[in-house]
Amino acid sequence: MNTQEPVSGTKDAKLHILCAGVSLMLVRMLKDQWDALHPELPAAVKPAGSVDLIRLCIAGEPCDVLISADDAILRDMMMPQYAEGYHIWAGNKIVVVGEGIGTENWEEKLLAPDATFKHHNPFGDPGGYRAVMAMLLADEYKPGLSERLLYHPGHIGMEKNPPPGSQREAQYEFTYYSGAKASGKSFAELPAVMDLSDTKLADVYARVCFAVDDENTVTATPIAHALTIPKTAVHQEAAKEFAGMFLALDKEAAGFLPRASVVGRDPLR
């Protein structure tokens, strides 16, 4: 495929990839391969929380491929004005990472009076609002547990606009299974009714939601990571090639759960 598309007024054309942190390891690996194949159009990778990435794309940030941690926000924030469809490329689940924590003792560890636990910013990152959703769903597992987790004095991460690098360290962290597996650290798997992994529990998950801003409230769904090519992509054909290479990667080997489908118009066609 010829990716040498003319770009008026620029001598250093790049393929701009905006990617969620959960996909960064895969994207970095693919960038090296892409750059070797296409030195005329190297990939410029920008990682961030998916809500923030979508806001950047809508505001005019160069974006040829957008890889989101959550398909729902692509649908709700970008379609149909900024994108016509997307590929779901993997599933995942929420777990808790930390020294000595496991599936048998996570309640005890997190509810200890001196425990501290954190997550990403829920107002900009699906990993953050999914952690909050997991806590909200804790009542489905054990009534009263949601409030004890959400309002625990050691719960860190609910500040809306924290200064960069200001978040305190914590003993435990709510994160994705794929990231936990890659880290090599101890982690606890949560009950399926909390971990947002089971498509059969979609109706249960949908009982909770989170407002990321005044205009967008996200309803909990089984985790689906997704990829789109915005209408504003400058390098449309190259974006399709990069996206196809990404979709062909072995995501299960990287700790992701198998899940794949197309919603709306296939951006690769």
Explain the meaning of each model-derived region.
Residues K93:
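Short beta-strand->alpha-helix junction loop in the catalytic core
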Residues Q81-H87:
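Central helical "cap/lid" subdomain
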Residues M1-L37, P42, V51, I58, ...:
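Exported/periplasmic ABC-transporter solute-binding proteins
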